């Protein structure tokens, strides 16, 4: 719910350049060729580790990036700096910088929720087909009996989500104000990046701390999968409303009879 970022490349180049430009810097005595190789390996390891400690800003997409309509010209406010920017804004909704920033964060959080929702629908249905659970149906899950009554669950969810969303809102207004990563006085600390908290809890594999270009690739993959998940969830809602069936059940029926079991048959049968 809570939703990495100076340049690792710059950090690496700075460390390397400082060694070249400061020849008077004291170095440990080298006794043999093998120890020289070991020292160089240790220096390279230090450089790599130093780069991993600073999260990277996304590398903006080039001017010739793919656009939603080939041959079109993107609006000036969509300059390729946002993940998943294909120049699509026909109504000019993102012309205001503050509004564009809000839209980007709103799309990001809705994408993540949609990916969680689609996963939470598909996996239980697969488990039901494998015989691990019985009588699963995601669209009437709210009417089931749980360990507490619906009012208690609703209040608990509102309190927990309110706390997390409040912190996310504070981070949007003042980036880094709710950062939970520890700061070290003798190390280059990552700068805050709204929507990508990183750290042990949200980036334990440190994928968001590479060089800028791979970071942009990963974030673009996330937003593209999130957009697909939002469309998938709308499709699940449509299926549940018109067929009262689950997604995999609808998929199996469509594969068995594509000509008669499709989206058009849902309209003609009602």
Swiss-Prot record:
Residues 1-33 form a transit peptide. Residues 19-36 have a biased composition (Polar residues). It holds the Pfam family Chloroa_b-bind. Chlorophyll b 2 binds at residue 112. It is found in: Plastid, Chloroplast thylakoid membrane. Chlorophyll a 1 binds at residues 88, 107, 227. The light-harvesting complex (LHC) functions as a light receptor, it captures and delivers excitation energy to photosystems with which it is closely associated. Seems involved in the function of the photosystem I in low light conditions, when other LHCA proteins are less abundant. Required, together with LHCA5, for the formation of a full-size NAD(P)H dehydrogenase-photosystem I supercomplex (NDH-PSI) that triggers cyclic and chlororespiratory electron transport in chloroplast thylakoids, especially under stress conditions (e.g. increased light intensity). The LHC complex consists of chlorophyll a-b binding proteins. Homodimer. Binds pigments. Element of the NAD(P)H dehydrogenase-photosystem I supercomplex (NDH-PSI). This is Photosystem I chlorophyll a/b-binding protein 6, chloroplastic. It comes from Arabidopsis thaliana (Mouse-ear cress).
